[in-house]
């Protein structure tokens, strides 16, 4: 092979050539990229795998973006992930891609070590988490970042109507509370903070491992704290509304009904 051919200066850079169609592209990039991560949590760092989407806006006169540079940026990412590193990642992307606007989002499994309510036995709970960040460079050259966080939290709900009309017990089920929030980048919110907002408002939170005294506690706790899906979504929304770190939010609650072959759901969105 001709060594001169391997020199970048000797290769045509087609993607940087001029495009004459006068059509800017709002988003162009890569998705479905799996990449190892170290996650920072309230109880220490742990490894996970993120599924990434990264894109930039492309001006009308430019034929293509620098696709390989998205991966190059990921390869350099070696800090534990939290809100600060997510903001830094999307900021670093703009000059590297010669872009004025860019977006990064990735989903991973977040683990929290929890102690059972009575026995204290510890186990891990898993939550599906997505970080989202959009960076825009204004005419003055400064970069503004919008930071978002989404967490899907499994909880337990017990039906108030079933409790009221039944001589014994009440139907209950697992529920999912999915919260998508836009954060103030000048403050710090952890994944555990967001997860807690859902777990505190459920009939009961969940644990990976429970002993019999714990199971008794969960059963009695949920029975004394019944909630419709409407109650659940309103109570979680009220907690998010009161959190000054959150600028806007969407809360989705879904009950996987144990007495029906369908789900019940509710949604609240709010911008402060």
From Swiss-Prot:
Top-rank lineage group of the source organism: Bacteria
Enzyme Commission numbers on file: 3.5.4.16
Keyword field: Hydrolase
Keyword match Glycoprotein: no
Main EC class the enzyme belongs to: hydrolase
Reactions mediated catalytically: GTP + H2O = 7,8-dihydroneopterin 3'-triphosphate + formate + H(+)
InterPro entries in UniProt: GTP_cyclohydrolase_FolE2, GTP_cyclohydrolase_FolE2/MptA
GO molecular function: GTP cyclohydrolase I activity
Cited Gene3D superfamilies: Urate Oxidase (3.10.270.10)
Site (May be catalytically important): 159
Pathway info: Cofactor biosynthesis; 7,8-dihydroneopterin triphosphate biosynthesis; 7,8-dihydroneopterin triphosphate from GTP: step 1/1
GO biological process: tetrahydrofolate biosynthetic process
Classification via Pfam families: GCHY-1
Family annotation (NCBIfam families): PRK13674.1-1 (NF010200)
Function, in words: Converts GTP to 7,8-dihydroneopterin triphosphate.
Family membership: Belongs to the GTP cyclohydrolase IV family.
Protein name in the entry: GTP cyclohydrolase FolE2
Organism of provenance: Polynucleobacter asymbioticus (strain DSM 18221 / CIP 109841 / QLW-P1DMWA-1) (Polynucleobacter necessarius subsp. asymbioticus)
Name of the coding gene: folE2
